[in-house]
A protein has these predicted regions:
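Short, flexible helix-loop junctions that flank or precede catalytic/ligand sites
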Residues: 1-155
């Protein structure tokens, strides 16, 4: 298909993966160390364009603290296992989603045959959240584990 017609007809692109959900019956909350927070921030911001001031790592940390923190501190979750989850620590599934809305600028890049890296950069600037980023937010919310997110999403 020619790039012009393809770009003109494309509205959105959706990717999704399923991850195992943490058992809510045995889920335990612990304080997150500064090192763990730094590693998660590194993982989350890995795909961000390096030369764009709109992507502020410190603002992201503050936002996470507001949305996911407990008593002014970031927390992490672990599940030792219980009778409700058959001692696995996991029960059910949750979806990770990546939705790329085709904006005017993305359409132009597709029509001119831009490389995948350029398309991803523009999609991130336009507000797309990657599978990994959606997964990390679900880790911070206590829905799934970082191991699950890493196993099902690429960097």
């Amino acid at each position: 298909m020619d790039p012009f017609n393809f770009a003109d007809s494309l509205l959105v692109v959706l990717a999704q993966r399923l991850v195992r959900r943490l058992c809510t019956q045995c889920r335990v909350i612990e304080p997150m160390s500064a090192q763990e927070l730094t590693e998660i921030l590194d993982d989350y911001t890995h795909a961000w364009p390096k030369d764009d001031a709109r992507f502020d790592r410190e603002q992201l940390r503050v936002d996470w603290l507001t949305r996911f923190g407990r008593e002014g501190q970031m927390v992490k979750y672990h599940t030792p296992g219980c009778i409700h989850c058959n001692q696995t620590g996991q029960k059910g599934r949750a979806g990770l989603h990546e939705l790329m809305t085709v904006t005017r600028e993305l359409r132009r890049l597709i029509q001119t045959g831009a490389r995948a890296e350029e398309l991803q950069r523009q999609a991130l600037i336009d507000g797309m959240r990657t599978l990994r980023q959606d997964g990390i937010e679900k880790v911070l919310a206590g829905i799934t584990s970082m191991e699950e997110v890493r196993a099902t999403s690429n960097v």
